[in-house]
Regions:
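N-terminal auxiliary segments of SAM/dcSAM-dependent transferases
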Residues: 2-61
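A short SAM/SAH-binding and catalytic strip from SAM-dependent methyltransferases
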Residues: 161-175, 190
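Class I SAM-dependent methyltransferase Rossmann-like catalytic core
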Residues: 10, 62-83, 87
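A short acidic, Gly/Pro-enriched loop at the edge of an enzyme's catalytic core
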Residues: 152-163
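Short alpha-helix
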Residues: 210-225
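Class I SAM-dependent methyltransferase SAM/SAH-binding core
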Residues: 99-153
């Protein structure tokens, strides 16, 4: 019989409790009280029945609805991202107890795909969109711990993460550098200039400027941070 989602998440956090930090005060998670995480300053975070966890100060982003994540899930299940994810997999160090975090995981399909090859490594998928994390829990229960969190305030201790995956989403290099362990790896996937060009050409037929995309600023910023 499959373990309940809420129990699986509690057990995962208990096993890796030393990796997490309070998003309010950055203190250590001191205890697991039933289905709640409690930091040393008594801030409390409850695991819900879906097994997900809200680990950020503000309310979750509600700009993205469930329909968007349903379509993204369907695209992922078609195998569209698999060649890219195979390349990502080849870059991940296979070290047990080295936490891997997918920052901006959406509905979780990329990390769920990777989990099939990383069965002994702790995985966390995080996104600021509540609907994305709920979809991840619905489709990919027990593949990873799914949390609502903000990349500007990562709920992890300093030097606690072995690998960060940042796929087609914004970055916060200050936070990335804080949580990466010595020798840790950041894998950032940046769209190419022709990314979604067919859609842009259809959506912006009367605006040629918006039909084009440049990743030069993103690439340059990455090079500045990691010369």
């Amino acid at each position: 019989m499959m373990q309940k989602k809420i129990d699986w998440s509690r057990d995962f956090i208990q096993k890796h409790q030393q990796l997490f930090a309070c998003p309010y005060c950055h203190a250590a998670i001191e205890t697991i009280d039933g289905y709640s995480l409690v930091c040393t300053n008594r801030h409390r975070f409850d695991i819900n029945k879906k097994g997900t966890l809200h680990l950020m100060k503000q309310k979750a982003n509600e700009d993205y609805d469930a329909e968007l994540f349903t379509h993204r899930y369907e695209l992922a299940q078609s195998g569209f991202f698999n060649p890219l994810l195979d390349e990502v997999l080849s870059l991940i160090p296979k070290q047990e107890n080295q936490l891997i975090v997918d920052i901006g995981c959406g509905e979780g399909s990329p990390l769920a795909y990777l989990s099939s090859f990383l069965e002994t490594i702790p995985l966390v998928g995080m996104d600021i969109a509540k609907e994305g994390i709920l979809a991840a829990s619905n489709h990919h229960a027990q593949k990873a711990l799914w949390i609502v969190a903000d990349l500007a305030q990562l709920p992890f201790k300093d030097e606690s993460c072995g690998t960060l995956i940042n796929m087609l989403t914004p970055s916060n290099y200050k936070e990335f550098n804080r949580v990466l362990a010595p020798g840790g790896k950041l894998i950032k996937i940046i769209p190419g200039s022709n990314y979604l060009i067919e859609l842009r050409q259809q959506l912006y037929k009367s605006n040629e400027e918006r039909q084009h995309y440049s990743n030069e600023d993103i690439v340059e910023r990455f090079k500045q941070e990691y010369p």
